[in-house]
Amino acid sequence: MNNAGDTLSDNLLGDAAERLFAQTCTPALLRAAEQGQPIDAAWRACEDAGFADALVPESLGGAGLPLAAALPVVLAAGRHLCPYPIAHTMLARGWLAAHGHARPAGPIALAPHGLSVADHRIAGTNVPWIRVASHVLAQINGQAWLLPLQAADVQSNGVHGSLDGEASWALADAQCLGPIRASDEQNGREGREGRLGRNGHDGRDGQDGRHGQDGPDGHNGQRAADTPDALALLAATAYAGLMAGAMERVLAMTLDYANTRAQFGKSIGRFQAVQQQISVMAEEVWAANMAAQLAFQSQVTQPGNLPRVMAGALPNAMPGETPGSIPSAMPGAMPGAMPGAMPGAMPGAMPGAMPSAMPSATPGATPGAMPGVMPSVMPGAMQAAVGKARTSQAAPRVADIAHAVHGAIGVTAEFDLQLYTRRLRDWRLAAGSESFWHAHIGAHALQGEDSALDFIRRVAQGQA
């Protein structure tokens, strides 16, 4: 089980990320990114803090943290809508390092679906983070490809404010890294043993234009429909954490607005109908938080290592609030809602600096790891599927209730709520919506002979 040292480590890392993102990833910066303005300074601050290489082994210059330790950073990135793919980059660099591939500089986007090869080019119509990333780590017909943005022809996808877009590359500019699978951490080494050339011309994936496109339905003619590949699991995990963090912030904004907006002589948060809706919203937010914790459990973990509830449960009324009002913040869950009150913060810690040592760590070991076992950067397949499915399921309901409480002001360009709800709806579909992942979960459950309860237990324990 997780111990106090792990909790403190998570708090230190999450607090450092919270401070950095609060200072560098403002709503103004996100609006600038949506308009195509550069955000290089914000990215450099994040990379200098060490977050991008948090999952890379220490022997390769990273922090060597286990997958679960990355969740507080991803939640903070979601709360502040970081306009660069830090969650994707952390997971992509960890995966590349684990498979012996060079890690390119700059932010990396994960694109498990939507890219295809035809007429000597690789192309996609809705490539994630294409307007702000420097590379795309893509899955095409069971192969991993590293695509540099400098060589890409990028076009708008026509969606207002989207950081995704259309892109294409000459095949000669792309680097094939070899075959990938969902549960084999060693398979990346196969691609380094010379079976494939630089552009992956092995006779199955050549240049004759007869290439299927890997879509969110998982069908590409070569892979089982109920076996998500590694990049799909990584992307699902990243989006689960981002959505959970963004929903925390949306709930905080809604609570604050409900307690300050007066109607008929009292705050609207004191009306029972509004309280009931926000209660439903809070349930969805906390379900998403727990789902994200489940998704960030790596394949190498302690049996029975269930995700823990992050510091603070749904609180009672805060001091000074009138009876019947809605609590203004959830301590420990949304540090951004309470500036300066971050439980577990290190006194005197430098803003934005990732803690260089974790209290529970021993030399050469990573916090929370099993003795003698290197934690995997890969999430458990069913844990990632459940995490993404549940957060995607919660996203539209949270967004709808937030806009219902805010009314017309919530959709105005000047108000920040629409920045969050637009991304929640985008991220709900990214890397597969809840219906896509529900199909995988159901197919996996039907393959076994467990009861429903036993299946849930095995998923929660990473044994499914």
Residue spans for each PLM region:
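Alpha-helical interface subdomain recognition
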Residues: 1-80, 186-188, 195, 237-464
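Hydrophobic alpha-helical segments that drive targeting, anchoring, or assembly
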Residues: 63, 67-74, 78-98, 111-113
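FAD-binding core of flavoproteins
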Residues: 87, 94-245, 252, 311, ...
